[in-house]
């Protein structure tokens, strides 16, 4: 067992999933690539992806279903499973428990039952965030007792289950990766949202003083880290140091929070000569007011105290462990990643 013979990517039809397909497609020797998802693969791929869809085997199913999961693993004959399926932020807390906790429990159980050797789990850098500043955090930072939100709470629970499932005596090795601020082609939230802000004429507003450093990570780099983790777990010489461990994954270039937004806006020709700064305490009060008004009107609030805290917090991480043990180096820089994302958006897919 020294190479990836067959990989099953759970959540492979999603944003990160497409980048995972690309990274596994590009390695040599190329493994059999299988996708398990409740959604079909996109009918039309962006030019940013070069893999051949005909080479990808698709399995439709529910990751909380033991039968669906077992059938997909057995049919794929996967010796590596990558679990990146997760609902997006801002949804009902119940869906996070169903997918992130119950779904992950089922994935672990079926991997063990079917004799899978490697499980790589996509966690989140947000599992250590509770609204307080995060300065150069490494993997020794504790999970907070009071989580920031249901998404990160359930991600932390799932991560813990995956790490505790690591069992070298049964030839089952696990690892959890914690990417921060993912963006790239296929992103339906971050960059598209920033573009919409500019179109609405709101790019002149800034929440916070913009002195807070923040980690953004290109999706292709995150996918690359998953491939490296799988390879290290398959190698008898490196698996002991990697199995049962967590790793922060970033672009290793913390930037001031609003720098990415302004890079996007600049690329689109939106350059504001004057910026209106809304200080953090004022913005939090405005967030509470927005929530109250939106609740009265039965609408989703645009500004919330939660969003203000995220925008104003320091959140950057130390990836020395990933560099040393995984051999991870971000290959696509922030500006190049933004350009790739904008090019994808301009395709209108």
From Swiss-Prot:
The keyword Transcription regulation does not apply. It catalyses: 4beta-methylzymosterol-4alpha-carboxylate + NADP(+) = 3-dehydro-4-methylzymosterol + CO2 + NADPH. The keyword NADP applies. CDD domains: 3b-HSD-NSDHL-like_SDR_e (cd09813). NADP(+) binds at residues 11-17, 62-63, 84-86, 151, 155, 179-182. Substrate binds at residues 124, 151. Keywords: Endoplasmic reticulum, Lipid biosynthesis, Lipid metabolism, Membrane, NAD, NADP, Oxidoreductase, Steroid biosynthesis, Steroid metabolism, Sterol biosynthesis, Sterol metabolism. Its EC number is 1.1.1.170. GO terms for cellular component: endoplasmic reticulum; endoplasmic reticulum membrane. GO terms for biological process: ergosterol biosynthetic process. Inhibited by FR171456, a natural product with broad antifungal activity. GO terms for molecular function: 3-beta-hydroxysteroid dehydrogenase (NAD+)/C4-decarboxylase activity; 3-beta-hydroxysteroid dehydrogenase [NAD(P)+]/C4-decarboxylase activity. The active site is at residue 155. It holds the Pfam family 3Beta_HSD. It comes from the Eukaryota. It is an enzyme of class 1 (oxidoreductase). It is found in: Endoplasmic reticulum membrane. Pathway: Steroid biosynthesis; zymosterol biosynthesis; zymosterol from lanosterol: step 4/6. It is a peripheral membrane protein. SUPFAM superfamilies: NAD(P)-binding Rossmann-fold domains. Present with 2580 molecules/cell in log phase SD medium. Sterol-4-alpha-carboxylate 3-dehydrogenase; part of the third module of ergosterol biosynthesis pathway that includes the late steps of the pathway. The third module or late pathway involves the ergosterol synthesis itself through consecutive reactions that mainly occur in the endoplasmic reticulum (ER) membrane. Belongs to the 3-beta-HSD family. Heterotetramer of ERG25, ERG26, ERG27 and ERG28. ERG28 acts as a scaffold to tether ERG27 and other 4,4-demethylation-related enzymes, forming a demethylation enzyme complex, in the endoplasmic reticulum. This is Sterol-4-alpha-carboxylate 3-dehydrogenase ERG26, decarboxylating. The lineage of its organism: Eukaryota, Fungi, Dikarya, Ascomycota, Saccharomycotina.
